[in-house]
Structures are given as C-alpha cells and as structure tokens.
C-alpha cells in the first residue's frame, strides 16, 4: 500500500498528549478531521485516530485518541504522519494530487501532438502553475486554469492544453 506524507510532528502542546505539527498537505481540514486515521511513516502498522484538531498560528494542533499524555506525545516528536492511499479520499472535479500530475504528457488539444512533460508544480497564488519540459529541454510555465488546461486524464497520464499566445516562447 502507498502512503503520503501529511505532517511532521514538531513538539508536544499541553499535558494531555496534543501535538503541534508542520503541515505537508494541501488538505489539512480533511486530513486532520475527527475520526481520520493516520500512521507514522516509520511504522505504518500503527494507526493514530484524530480525536480533534485545530489550526494554531502557521501550524496545526492534533489530539489523537491513542495518545493521552505528554510522555506518549513526546515519543512522537520528529515523526512524519502519513495517510494511506485508501484513506486519502476523492478530490472534487478539477483538483488533482501533485503526484498524479507529475510526469504527465502535455498534449496540444487542437493538433493532438505531444508538447512535453510536466516536471514541476508551483503554487504562487490563486492557481497552480505547471512547468512543461519539451523533448529538446526547453521549459515554460503554464497556468492551471480552464482557458489553458482543457482536460486531465490521470489514468492515461495526459494533460490536454490550449496554449495562449505568449505562454510558449517560439523561436
């Protein structure tokens, strides 16, 4: 089974076993929802059940049902929390996990020709931008917006695009 990193446990918070985590997921509200099952990267057989959680400054505080005091919580310091693929959940239409977009072939929707591959993803603002690398090594960013990204076929690892003028530097 595949697991995905969601947070790093930084320290304890209070005396009742609550931990402060640095978030490594785009979906903390879902990942840390009451009843959610998480594991430790170092021991995926150990399941921790979220009892409650809340944002705290730029971090999150999580209380697990199985961790009831500061001594138990202290042993988790530095651990990476992971979610299993089966617990990862479905995303709304038009939202994708980064791992599903990396290495997708980029296809010109009009011509059907392969343009390149997605090799990086950044989130500078309202929309993600995807770095396309052509076979000759030329790279450029495309925004993940409806005017450009027309269709994503995760199963086939293909992204169909209509490139706006100026997105791709033509020699």
UniProtKB/Swiss-Prot annotation:
List the signal peptide residues. Answer: none
* Cellular-component GO terms for this entry: cytoplasm; ribosome
Q: Membrane-spanning residues where?
A: none
Pfam families associated with the record: PRC_RimM, RimM
Question: Domain PRC barrel, which positions?
Answer: 93-167
UniProt superkingdom: Bacteria
Alphabetic keyword roster: Chaperone, Cytoplasm, Ribosome biogenesis, rRNA processing
Which GO terms of the molecular function aspect are on file? ribosome binding
The record's listing under InterPro entries reads:
PRC_barrel-like_sf, PRC_RimM, RimM, RimM_N, RimM_N_sf, Transl_B-barrel_sf
Q: Which SUPFAM superfamilies match?
A: PRC-barrel domain, Translation proteins
Query: Is this entry keyworded Amino-acid biosynthesis?
Result: no
Domain free text: The PRC barrel domain binds ribosomal protein uS19.
Which family, according to UniProt?
Belongs to the RimM family.
What the protein does comes down to:
An accessory protein needed during the final step in the assembly of 30S ribosomal subunit, possibly for assembly of the head region. Essential for efficient processing of 16S rRNA. May be needed both before and after RbfA during the maturation of 16S rRNA. It has affinity for free ribosomal 30S subunits but not for 70S ribosomes.
Protein's name according to its UniProt entry: Ribosome maturation factor RimM
